[in-house]
Regions:
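C-terminal/domain-terminus segments
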Residues: 189-230
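Generic helix N-cap/helix-start motif at coil->alpha-helix transitions
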Residues: 15-17, 155-156, 187-189
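Sec-dependent signal peptide recognition
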Residues: 1-10
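Residue-level recognition of tetratricopeptide repeat
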Residues: 45-47, 90, 134, 188, ...
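N-terminal leader/linker segments that initiate helical-solenoid repeat arrays
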Residues: 9, 13-61
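Short coil/linker segments at helix-helix boundaries
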Residues: 23-24, 31-32, 54-89, 96-133, ...
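TPR alpha-solenoid repeat register
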Residues: 48-50, 93, 137, 191, ...
Length: 239
């Protein structure tokens, strides 16, 4: 068989597999998406590797159980690292490495959260530069600014001890990023919740209410959305 035809057939097959994985993910069939990733595993396929990291993240995101979250994020990390090694200029590889390393920091406590924060910012900003229209990375950077702005005094003391120049973030910048995420994808509950949380932090209560009212019109698709709806109701009760 002509080598060009062989390469074309392989590329067509991989595109078909990746499209099916994306479809399963869109339908919230995360375990099926994970299985399809594992069944077609290739240590040199950047697009499969970041999808594998995403699948583990999605499973972690469906629960409030910390042990289950940690287990799946730990599984996701080496795949996100490998994807970045293969193609440092892949927007999705940069995005998912930033997401996973950020989640790992949040789950492991204050010091690790601060240590990982610089990587989250570095790879998150690079992902936006490579693909400015992906809502997920705008959300990621919104969360980064929110988390840094929301550091308690003792966490800031730890940050100052670790770094000569601790990370700096503001709720206003978080709001801007969440706004970008909503503009790009107005159907994701996460963007509205975290924009409202940021508005709440700067006492913009009426604007926060308005954002949560918009969120209430969005279809709930999976367990993660159900968790978000409960958080939205809790925040609304404070306004």
């Amino acid at each position: 068989m002509n080598i060009f035809i062989r390469v074309l057939l392989v590329s067509s097959f991989l595109f078909s597999v990746n499209s099916k994985i994306d479809q399963l993910q869109e339908e919230s069939k995360f375990q099926e998406a994970l299985k399809l990733c594992e069944d077609n595993y290739n240590d040199n396929d950047v697009d499969l590797l970041w999808r594998l990291a995403r699948a583990y993240f999605d499973i972690a995101d469906q629960t409030s159980n910390i042990d289950i979250k940690k287990n799946n994020i730990d599984k996701a990390l080496p795949y996100s690292k490998r994807a970045l090694e293969i193609d440092p200029n892949s927007a999705k590889a940069n995005h998912w490495y930033a997401v996973i390393i950020g989640q790992k920091g949040l789950l492991e406590g204050t010091k690790q959260k601060i240590l990982n924060s610089y990587d989250v910012r570095e790879y998150g900003l690079k992902a936006i530069k490579l693909d400015p229209k992906y809502d997920g990375t705008h959300h990621l950077m919104g969360r980064w600014h929110y988390n840094v702005a929301d550091l308690a005094w003792y966490e800031r003391t730890i940050a100052s001890a670790i770094y000569a120049t601790p990370p700096e973030g503001t709720f206003e910048e978080a709001i801007e990023y969440f706004g970008n995420a909503i503009d790009t994808n107005p159907n994701d509950l996460r963007h509205y919740l975290w924009m409202a949380k940021s508005l709440y932090k700067i006492s913009e209560y009426e604007k926060a209410k308005s954002i949560l009212d918009e969120a209430s019109k969005i279809e709930v698709k999976n367990e993660s959305d159900k968790i978000l709806i409960n958080q939205i109701k809790e925040l609304y009760s404070k306004l």
